[in-house]
């Protein structure tokens, strides 16, 4: 009989072990056996909680997406300035939060993006994440710009966030958060300046 209250603990152990395994050997070589060993559990526990490796990857991505959402939400809740600029900066900062730019998270995101092209459940997660980012950016830009300019600015800033993140992930070095923030801030300020132009 399973111990009461163990499910959340086991799931968390396995998600963190997945992040560690992907960081160490990549998604392709992150076997169920390796993940179980890193989590200190038997292989069968993964099947019990997640069915298979794809289920575990989906749960791991939901964990990262939840951390991303929390990082953005906390920054926006702490704002004293309700301007579109302040909200846009908070969204950018949340996307470059340490929970998203540490080595294990970055490698897992890269594996997720590649796998999402072939797995419908992961593709749905990716689409939801893309839509959420675009929608939040567009709403804030729309507070100050025309609808067409707001949509274009939101697409541009979303692409810039993803591009800065991807280039940072592929360097193999520690992510330069300050540089990424400064580039993104400069872009959003240029877009917001169109109101008076």
From Swiss-Prot:
Q: Which SUPFAM superfamilies match?
A: Homeodomain-like (SSF46689), Tetracyclin repressor-like, C-terminal domain (SSF48498)
Q: Which InterPro entries match?
A: BetI_C (IPR039538), DNA-bd_HTH_TetR-type_CS (IPR023772), Homeodomain-like_sf (IPR009057), HTH-type_TetR-like_transc_reg (IPR050109), HTH_TetR (IPR001647), Tet_transcr_reg_TetR-rel_C_sf (IPR036271), Tscrpt_rep_BetI (IPR017757)
**Pathways involved:** Amine and polyamine biosynthesis; betaine biosynthesis via choline pathway [regulation]
Sorted keywords for this record are: DNA-binding, Repressor, Transcription, Transcription regulation
Does the UniProt entry include the keyword Transcription? yes
Function, as annotated: Repressor involved in the biosynthesis of the osmoprotectant glycine betaine. It represses transcription of the choline transporter BetT and the genes of BetAB involved in the synthesis of glycine betaine.
- Protein name stated in the entry: HTH-type transcriptional regulator BetI
Q: Which organism is it from?
A: Pseudomonas aeruginosa (strain ATCC 15692 / DSM 22644 / CIP 104116 / JCM 14847 / LMG 12228 / 1C / PRS 101 / PAO1)
